[in-house]
């Protein structure tokens, strides 16, 4: 999972991109990068492992000159955590092209072989984002004229759609031309467009979430549609075109459950409002299925932070007190998206501490957005017991996650998912709770559709095992499980520790 941002302006963009990336930091804490185009048509690039505030210092910001640029925050779902795979990526031909990407390609092995054999392009890392850049650049390279017009750009995007499979929200910047934003035919990963009027001219901005627009004073215009490309020249002229055949919006449902900030709006849906609906529906299910247990519940406590709005609605529906029983250390990364199981285990207790008075001698209903590996849930339950809870009920705002995600979320193996092959009682025993309940999938999708009924479908593959791109085989799932387990990641990081190319130090 990643966060991306791009700005075409009449004034320097380095500080605005930096500010926007800090608002997208929740989407990835592994690495960050910014690239700009200066007055001499040169790319200025800085990228490294770490948080935005750690990667960019004053000397880096001063070098990132120019009125157009891209930014990226990364959590690796493929490849390694090596700085060589931090984004943006860059190729010098044709023109000079740089790209940032959120998502995951599902046919990268075949594509890497094809791009070398047919285009003689070398992809230096295992990143599918570098591969995607080379595919786009190759199609641009086959356009005969020296200067590209908007239709040429859209032609290259159409050809790219025909080549690649999977999830991709992308921004690419072409020297001497402009910036193009495009989204896969299912719109699995989010991408929004904003504008700002300045000195009688219009600046444009693209970002993964609307919250990034807000901080730098851009007005939300609309979402980039599934399969659409939007091109902005460096002179500020905007063009758009549908570039994919049979494009149908199916956004990732997990964006609304977990990833996106509550103050963002994605595909016409307020993330906050969707979570309120999730809480209402889950509260109604609890009231119905646990009717004999409701009187025993003393207090409803959220697991910070995504579930707070959900838990508040559950407490309202059940008529129970809502309390903050955990205090979060905001300077520790999100545990679900931290690379490595050992890191996740050690991080939970550094991330959360209990307010013991809210647990002591009480029957508590803990509410979390989801249960993925079960690592976090098990430790949270242990903390609640240690704080004196008599009985622990647990409610998940998402259904059981039984299948790996192949579209940009780090759920590589069924064996790493606690719900795979287990029923609710078995999961409850493993995480140590007295009673456990999950949201129904229908209730979850309805919670989002209440905010935008025009969305007819979602990517729900982690719950159903049905992959909307239609190209996922059991062999593919086995392959990524082998490639992405923790031991494999450690091996790749050791092998690729020093591949830093085109990087401002």
Swiss-Prot record:
Q: Where does Mg(2+) bind?
A: 306, 368-369
Q: Where is this region: Disordered?
A: 484-505
Q: Which residues form the Glutamine amidotransferase type-2 domain?
A: 2-235
The reaction(s) this protein catalyses: 5-phospho-beta-D-ribosylamine + L-glutamate + diphosphate = 5-phospho-alpha-D-ribose 1-diphosphate + L-glutamine + H2O
Where are its TM segments located?
none
| Assigned EC number | 2.4.2.14
PROSITE patterns documented for this protein? GATASE_TYPE_2, PUR_PYR_PR_TRANSFER
Which biological pathway? Purine metabolism; IMP biosynthesis via de novo pathway; N(1)-(5-phospho-D-ribosyl)glycinamide from 5-phospho-alpha-D-ribose 1-diphosphate: step 1/2
* Cofactor(s) it depends on: Mg(2+)
Listed SUPFAM superfamilies = N-terminal nucleophile aminohydrolases (Ntn hydrolases), PRTase-like
Q: Record's InterPro entries?
A: GATase_2_dom, Ntn_hydrolases_N, PRibTrfase_dom, PRTase-like, PurF, PurF_N
Binding note for cofactor: Binds 1 Mg(2+) ion per subunit.
Keywords, ordered alphabetically: Glutamine amidotransferase, Glycosyltransferase, Magnesium, Metal-binding, Purine biosynthesis, Transferase
Any one of the GO CC terms: cytoplasm
Q: Indicate, by first and last residue, each region the UniProt record lists as having compositional bias (Polar residues).
A: 496-505
Give one GO biological process term: 'de novo' IMP biosynthetic process
Gene Ontology molecular function, alphabetical: amidophosphoribosyltransferase activity; magnesium ion binding
Give the family per the record.
In the C-terminal section; belongs to the purine/pyrimidine phosphoribosyltransferase family.
What is the name listed in the Swiss-Prot or TrEMBL entry for this protein? Answer: Amidophosphoribosyltransferase
């Amino acid at each position: 999972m990643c966060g991306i941002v791009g700005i075409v302006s009449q004034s320097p963009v380095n500080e605005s991109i930096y500010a926007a990336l800090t608002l997208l930091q929740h989407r990835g804490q592994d690495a960050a990068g910014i690239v700009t185009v200066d007055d001499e048509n040169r790319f200025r690039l800085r990228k490294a492992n770490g948080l935005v505030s750690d990667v960019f210092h004053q000397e880096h910001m001063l070098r990132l000159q120019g009125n157009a640029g891209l930014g990226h925050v990364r959590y690796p779902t493929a490849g390694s955590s090596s700085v060589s795979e931090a984004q943006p990526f860059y190729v010098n031909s044709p023109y000079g092209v740089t790209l940032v990407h959120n998502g995951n390609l599902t046919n990268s092995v075949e594509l890497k072989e094809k791009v070398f054999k047919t285009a003689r392009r070398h992809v230096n890392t295992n990143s599918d984002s570098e591969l995607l850049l080379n595919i786009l650049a190759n199609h641009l390279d086959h356009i005969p004229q020296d200067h590209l017009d908007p239709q040429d750009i859209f032609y290259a995007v159409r050809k790219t759609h025909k080549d690649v499979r999977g999830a991709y929200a992308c921004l690419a910047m072409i020297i001497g031309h402009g910036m193009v934003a495009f989204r896969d035919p299912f719109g699995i990963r989010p991408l929004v467009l904003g504008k700002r009027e300045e000195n009688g001219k219009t600046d444009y901005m693209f970002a993964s979430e609307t919250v990034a627009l807000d901080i730098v004073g851009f007005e939300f215009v609309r979402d980039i549609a599934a399969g659409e490309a939007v091109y902005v020249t460096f002179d500020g002229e905007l063009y758009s075109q549908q570039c994919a055949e049979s494009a149908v919006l199916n956004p990732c449902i997990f964006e609304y459950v977990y990833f996106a900030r509550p103050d963002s709006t994605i595909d016409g849906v307020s993330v906050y409002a969707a979570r309120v609906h999730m809480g209402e529906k889950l509260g109604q299910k609890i009231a119905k299925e646990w009717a004999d247990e409701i009187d025993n519940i003393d207090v409803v406590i959220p697991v910070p932070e995504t579930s707070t709005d959900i838990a508040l609605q559950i407490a309202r529906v059940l008529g129970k007190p809502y309390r903050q029983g955990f205090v979060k250390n905001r300077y520790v990364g999100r545990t679900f998206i931290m690379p490595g199981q050992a890191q996740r285990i050690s991080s939970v207790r550094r991330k959360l501490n209990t307010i013991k008075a809210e647990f002591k001698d009480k029957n508590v209903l803990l509410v979390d957005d989801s249960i993925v590996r079960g690592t976090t849930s098990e430790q949270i339950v242990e903390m609640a017991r240690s704080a004196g809870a008599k009985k622990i009920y647990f409610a998940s705002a998402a259904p059981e996650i039984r299948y790996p995600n192949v579209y940009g979320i780090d759920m590589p193996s069924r064996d790493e998912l606690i719900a795979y092959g287990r029923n609710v009682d078995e999961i409850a025993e493993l995480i140590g709770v007295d009673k456990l309940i999950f949201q129904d999938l229908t209730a979850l999708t309805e919670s989002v559709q209440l905010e935008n009924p025009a969305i007819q479908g979602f990517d729900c593959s982690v719950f159903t095992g049905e992959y909307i791109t239609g190209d996922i085989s059991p062999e593919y799932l086995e392959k990524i499980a082998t490639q992405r387990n923790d031991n494999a990641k450690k091996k790749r990081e050791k092998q690729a520790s020093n591949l830093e190319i085109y990087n401002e130090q």
